[in-house]
Amino acid sequence: MDKRHNPSRRIIAPHGSKLSCKSWTTEAPMRMLMNNLHPDVAERPEDLVVYGGIGRAARDWECYDKIIEVLQRLEEDETLLVQSGKPVGVFKTHNNAPRVIIANSNLVPHWANWEHFNELDKKGLAMYGQMTAGSWIYIGSQGIVQGTYETFVAMAKQHFGGSSAGKWILTGGLGGMGGAQPLAGTMAGYSVLTCEVDETRIDFRLRTRYVDKKATSLDEALAMIDEANKSGKPVSVGLLANAADVFAELVERGITPDVVTDQTSAHDPLNGYLPQGWSLEQAADMRKKDEAAVVKAAKQSMAVQVKAMLALQAAGAATTDYGNNIRQMAFEEGVENAFDFPGFVPAYVRPLFCEGIGPFRWAALSGDPEDIYKTDAKVKELIPDNPHLHNWLDMARERIAFQGLPSRICWVGLKDRARLALAFNEMVKNGELSAPVVIGRDHLDSGSVASPNRETESMLDGSDAVSDWPLMNALLNTASGATWVSLHHGGGVGMGFSQHSGVVIVADGTDDAAARLGRVLWNDPATGVMRHADAGYDIAKNCAKEQGLDLPMLEK
């Protein structure tokens, strides 16, 4: 019997201002862990899977229950240690220390591969935490919508003279991450055709308003895209089909999308990518019988898809890897030029990272959407001269359905994160907000990740694989007083290809919280500016000087 599977469990985080733990600094991680497993948030909550193939919130249900139990008794001067989803110790620390420290999926580099991890996983000795699954700050697909939106806007500026009108995107994957693409694309003015092999995922995205329409044939989907482009009203279509099949067929037909990318769970060939010609049931059965055969077949299909992406690029499509390591998988399968199209970070996002700009997010522990709308207004008030940001907040309110606890994401940088956090804390203190908020981010941020095929691809100084930076980020956030800190391996791109850290902090209206917020929300993005300045980026060097960062080796 799999201790991770229990279809009878239905987890909903408490709402309101009544505590079930001893303080908000322990109530917050409890509610956010539970929120990760909300049926409208998680991909397979009955299996503790939040998103990204097998990205889990806890190792098994026994561990989940014990984590909740410990958080409810944890004192304000104690720290819970969670090792790959298992609560392993409680230690006396102090009230400015994190209440929870998490380490997920970390392996000694020589053994940092899927084969070794899967053996440990089968024995119940490890858990894949992805990025925000095992660090308890996943907020549904909204968590990646703005980053995807910013990328698509940047692509329009770079390739289409700033206008996406009449343009369409071809992509794959409607899971927890990929599900953001159709909404982000239409918000940026494109029509979007997304291939997905699991019909329940298409239906989930329809229900949560991330996808507009469903199609069961390529002809039907293309007709929907064509009609939308003629009418000038962008549409997103979820096509029930294998991405490798569709991408290759478009090449054969001579049909070239304007933008091509992919966000299937290609990072995990065993659990995350359905081989061509296979049914979901067949794949599930084969995983029990012959894992190596599944991996081989999946990677062969990825090779087909990447070859098609290269052909579409040659035909004129703006083509980018959206961070799922599909190029690496195809390269290992013999596609020698798999890396001829760039990753999205070096191509479109890195200038933002140089200024510490990244996916700042917060959630209302009250469960009241009004608390988010009030914080939206506060962001506009404090950052009045950023129409692009204001437009994002307006679109987010209008078009993004909350999943679980109401939350918001907006990309802001070093000079703004601490200001916003302190303002939110003041709103809790004076009663404008009905309960505290938690503030966190994705691990995909400027100073918190080493991932040579994604966030740190093609660094100016060649330091792509240096992972000291996320380790220092986690240690500094711990020293600065974050409420919980996490250090993971393998998120986004799979085992052996990334190390990254997460941070979450509670704004509970107290003066102690204000001091912690000021430190954490300055230091955390500052490490991103530091990392990019150290790599030689002029934007980061200038930002460091403007913001007065003390970087001893930076020329004054």
Swiss-Prot record:
Entry coiled-coil feature ranges: none
Could you give a GO molecular-function term held by this entry?
urocanate hydratase activity
Top-level division of the source organism's lineage = Bacteria
**Residues that bind NAD(+):** 52-53, 130, 176-178, 196, 201, 242-243, 263-267, 273-274, 322, 492
Q: Which Gene3D superfamilies match?
A: Urocanase like domains, Urocanase superfamily
Q: What is its main location?
A: cytoplasm
The EC designation for this entry is 4.2.1.49
- Name its co-factor(s): NAD(+)
Its pathway? Amino-acid degradation; L-histidine degradation into L-glutamate; N-formimidoyl-L-glutamate from L-histidine: step 2/3
Q: List the InterPro entries hit by this protein, alphabetically.
A: Urocanase, Urocanase-like, Urocanase_C, Urocanase_central_sf, Urocanase_CS, Urocanase_N, Urocanase_Rossmann-like, Urocanase_sf
Q: What cellular component terms from Gene Ontology apply here?
A: cytoplasm
Substrates-to-products reaction catalysed: 4-imidazolone-5-propanoate = trans-urocanate + H2O
Q: How is the cofactor bound?
A: Binds 1 NAD(+) per subunit.
Localisation per UniProt entry = Cytoplasm
Any one GO BP annotation for this protein: L-histidine catabolic process to glutamate and formate
Q: Name one Pfam family in it.
A: Urocanase_N
UniProt keyword annotations, A-Z: Cytoplasm, Histidine metabolism, Lyase, NAD
Q: Where is the active site?
A: 410
Q: What does this protein do?
A: Catalyzes the conversion of urocanate to 4-imidazolone-5-propionate.
Q: Read off the NCBIfam families from this record.
A: hutU (TIGR01228), PRK05414.1 (NF003820)
- Stated family: Belongs to the urocanase family.
Q: What name does this protein carry?
A: Urocanate hydratase
Gene this protein is translated from: hutU
